[in-house]
Amino acid sequence: APFITVFMYLNEARNEQEKKDLAMIIEETLRQRYEGVKNEKGVWITPAFPKLIYVLEEDNVREGTPYWYLTRLAAQCTAKRMVPDYISEKKMLELKVDKNGEGHCYTCMGCRSFLTPYVDPETNKPKYYGRFNQGVITINLVDVALSSGRDYDKFWKIFDERLELCHQGLLCRHERLKGTLSDAAPILWQYGALARLPKGEPIDKLLYGGYSTISLGYAGLYECVKYMTGKSHTDEEAKPFALKVMQHMNDACKGWKAMHNIDFSLYGTPLESTTYKFAKCLQNRFGMIPGITDKSYITNSYHVHVSEPIDAFTKLQFESEFQQLSPGGAISYVEVPNMQQNIDAVLELMQFIYDNIMYAELNTKSDYCQCCGYDGEIEIREDDGKLVWVCPNCGNTDQAKMNVARRTCGYIGTQYWNQGRT
């Protein structure tokens, strides 16, 4: 599938007519995704890509606004197909402020990687489209905590050592790109996708000064804090430590940026299949520690642990503070049941997103059993220590005869996953 994100933002239009034209395109895009894609069995299913992002703004966020009908259609689409995801123009304008003091609303790259604000020194105008990221290296916060043995002095010492290891790793990525000639990929470097360089010119100048970013990723904040404090980072006693960890990583990025004139930024790593790899490595190194290493996954970025009882609004409100500390990219999700008969509740969540958090999405279920035609939730059950997918209507366990769509880290998956992500 094409790795593409479609950004639906009415305020990008340069005039009212263009906005009306854009609204028609957005409407048709949402209707097409709501319908789905027909598979080889003739069943309309949820496609994984392209990813859709819908911007909530003053012209569409409340009933009675000119483009409210698009927002209601987006809510119906989310309830059925898990997209679009939502960016709050209001919050993004507050958080993404350039050196001229102007806030900006723009899309991410892929599922969550955001460029930092940048003003072109030649034009003194902001630029987002056509920039890029040089790469990511992720620090395993759980490993840092477990290696410290709950000794806080040791924790910060090990933390700094691991951060320096990430620093050197990111510089390796950067050095690999240096000297690359524009001829290596003309469509990127010569014809305008990322730049318009002459033939034979190195891309080096695009690697400095904020034109591109390079990301320090992090994973497992929940388990890190839980091990060190004995409490979840949602606990008021543990939250300050969690925020201190986040700020420490941001301070490291700030120092590296000043040192190299390269735009390092902190990034809430999606983790994808690496969540399983990290979990297994932790178990091999430290054994089974209840509540910390006893799962086949570690928690994505700053997220509240999946087992924690918390309502959608409280989760988004809590995570918004941590999202602000992930300027290189982050996203928050809430898990909801089938909402197709309760669109007003979806809209209420969307309006909460607009007022409280920059970037969020709703995860629901979108499944189909080819054996019996069941289109509710395909269940996960444990069978002899292994997780298997089962149709609750007919008992079908053949993955080739069911369509399952889930979003577990960043993208909607339709091809099943390793045991950690399952």
Where do the PLM segments sit?
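Long insertion/accessory domains within large nucleic-acid-processing enzymes
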Residues: 393-422
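Contiguous, well-ordered alpha-helical segments that form the cores/surfaces of helical PPI scaffolds
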Residues: 214-227, 247, 407
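Conserved catalytic cores of very large enzyme subunits
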Residues: 1-210, 231, 235-393, 397, ...
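Generic structural "secondary-structure junction" signal
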Residues: 141, 146, 218, 230, ...
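Glycine-centered flexibility motif
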Residues: 81-82, 217-220, 328-330, 406-410, ...
